[in-house]
Regions:
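Histidine-centered, transition-metal-coordinating active-site segments
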Residues: 1-187
Length: 187
């Protein structure tokens, strides 16, 4: 869909610093075709350009559901929930600017210690066993991925049927069930 294309290209440019020439090549290669259900869909005219796009999109998909991303969001949510339960902040406070919210977190010694601990996180570790005396979580996530249509000599086909390499990488990404404990790593 157009919105998925927009955020994929936007992130490719802003987060992953994709060269402008590659982004232009991707946009210039698109056309509207009919998918398997005879519905209009954006398609690629050339497999080489679809390959550039799918590498970018899969990299983003993996990044957005990485252990680091899932853990940091869950740990922050749990920290804010605890702050709310302790009366340190309200839901309305979350609509204020970050310095105000951080000031509230620092006003309570228990929450301030948790906040300072959160700020020291440099990554994550994971395993099948939950470590003792350690904040660890199992976190599922919705996976988004793209298998675009590409023009071939046989007509329009999904890129996974054209590129065995992409098909394998996409299958591996989709197979991850997040059935592991994740906890913070500190330097």
């Amino acid at each position: 869909s157009a919105d998925r294309l927009e955020y994929t290209l936007g992130n490719a440019h802003l987060v992953f610093h994709c060269p402008e020439a590659e982004l232009r090549a991707i946009c210039g290669d698109l056309f509207v075709g009919k998918n398997e259900e005879n519905i209009d869909e954006l398609c690629f005219a050339h497999a080489e350009i679809a390959d550039i796009f799918t590498r970018l999109s899969l990299r983003q998909s993996e990044w957005f559901v990485s252990d680091d991303d899932r853990f940091s969001m869950q740990a922050l949510a749990d920290l804010l929930r605890e702050a709310q339960q302790r009366g340190v902040l309200t839901l309305d406070d979350l609509y204020l600017d970050e310095p105000h919210v951080i000031g509230l977190l620092l006003s309570d010694p228990v929450i301030a210690a948790r906040w300072q601990d959160y700020r020291r996180i440099t990554g994550t570790q994971s395993g099948t066993q939950k470590p003792k005396n350690t904040y660890a979580v199992k976190i599922a996530a919705k996976k988004r991925s793209i298998d675009p249509l590409v023009q071939t000599s046989d007509g329009l086909r999904r890129f996974t049927s054209v590129s065995a390499d992409y098909a394998a990488k996409l299958a591996a990404f989709r197979a991850d069930d997040f059935d592991r404990w994740v906890w913070a790593k500190y330097e």
